[in-house]
Regions:
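Glycine-rich catalytic cores of cysteine/serine-nucleophile enzymes that process amide/ester linkages
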Residues: 20-88
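Bacterial N-terminal signal peptides
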Residues: 5-14
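Solvent-exposed, acidic/flexible segments
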Residues: 31-35, 92-102, 117-125
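Second-shell loop/turn segments in exported
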Residues: 27-28, 86-95, 110-118
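N-terminal hydrophobic targeting signals that begin at the initiator methionine
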Residues: 1-2
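Generic secondary-structure boundary/loop-capping signal
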Residues: 79-80, 89, 114, 143
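Sec/Tat signal peptide C-region and signal peptidase I cleavage site
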Residues: 15-19
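Activation targets extended, charge/polar-rich intrinsically disordered C-terminal tails
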Residues: 21, 104-166
């Protein structure tokens, strides 16, 4: 009976919630800025690090030059109001290894040399698409969707039915 009491006591002890970071894929429709795709990361790592950030890839300066070819690019973190006015398309839970891989990819894009942004070949959609592939999402870079963030992200949901409603 004493052992049963000890087992019951152990079962009733509070258990810390499993650490987890959630990555969400967002689109921002045409408004005061051009359409954009980006990711958010929120949660807590196994070592207790609180994560609450977002990343997108864009031109350093939005000028007509982006229509002509490659220009300087940058990883950008948007203000909470921008994120709030954007549309979350889907989310995926990450373990610490996946989170570290995403952060390494963000750093890779942050340190791309030279004129790293190209509206047709390396834009925000290419960035979020590469992140999506990294976390196990099937991605097809359809040419007609490479300037349409929302349509591109919705195409990923169609390719990966398990994302629907996430």
């Amino acid at each position: 009976m004493r052992i049963l009491g000890m087992i019951l006591a152990l079962l009733l002890m509070p258990v810390p919630a499993a650490a987890q970071v959630v990555i969400s894929f967002y689109s921002h429709d045409l408004g005061s800025t051009f359409p954009h795709a980006f990711i958010t990361l929120k949660g807590k790592t196994e070592d207790g690090q609180v994560v609450d950030t977002n990343f997108g890839f864009t031109a350093k300066s939005v000028t007509p030059a982006i229509l002509m070819g490659s220009v300087g690019g940058k990883i950008e973190t948007s203000k909470p109001s921008y994120v709030a006015s954007s549309d979350r398309q889907f989310s995926v839970k990450l373990d610490d290894r996946q989170y570290a891989s995403v952060m390494a990819l963000v750093e890779k894009w942050r340190t791309l040399p030279g004129k790293s942004y190209n509206l047709n070949k390396r834009n925000c959609i290419h960035f979020v698409g590469e992140v999506a592939q990294l976390v196990g999402i099937k991605v097809v870079f359809e040419k007609d969707l490479l300037k349409k963030p929302k349509s591109f992200l919705l195409s990923l949901v169609a390719l990966n039915p398990w994302l629907k409603g996430s």
